[in-house]
Amino acid sequence: LSREQLGQYTEALADYDNAISIKPDYAEPYFNKSLQMLLHGNFAEGWPLYEWRWKTEQNIGKGLKTSKPLWQGEKNANVFLWAEQGIGDEIMFASIIPELEEQCSNLTVKCDKRLIPLFERSFSKKINFQFDQSKVSEDSYEFHIPIASLPSVLRPSLDNFKQAPRSYLRCDNKKAEKLKQIISTDKTQTLIGISWNSSAKQPCAHHRNID
């Protein structure tokens, strides 16, 4: 990780490979290597390695408890898509929801309660959005998949991302118009709003500043 933070990416990858050769069942170097692969656009190797996140110390036991198999691209199936990580990650990976919905006969999505109005407004009315896990019966789906695993199935290459629609979220037009009226009465001005809150506990949080 020290080499990675210094920008010595080639050396960092070599260190990860060395760690893997010493202890092949240790998840951390696989996961860290996946982040490097994804950062540099090597999705073919990065996404499969990213699945090691579930075996890292911070994620052990956090996955969905179910007897149903992981969805790997099966057509016309009943699929349960469940959220992981933070609300920002849910929004980011949600761009792939329409592609998943095209593959399913029925899709249920568990997400943060705060996102349900946004997602219901932005995506197909056929999708069942839930925030309460207890309301999703295991009998209601054939396969499941965590939201951050979607790219490994549906966007395995950079070209897949380039071909995807650039906008996928729809604002509440009434609230947007009301906010515009509050902010400014000058219709000739362009209004730009930036509002975000994320965990400051993350080691890389200081890199997110836009000062």
Where are these regions (language model features)?
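Alpha-helical solenoid repeat scaffolds of the TPR/TPR-like class and their adjacent stem/linker regions
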Residues: L1-D211
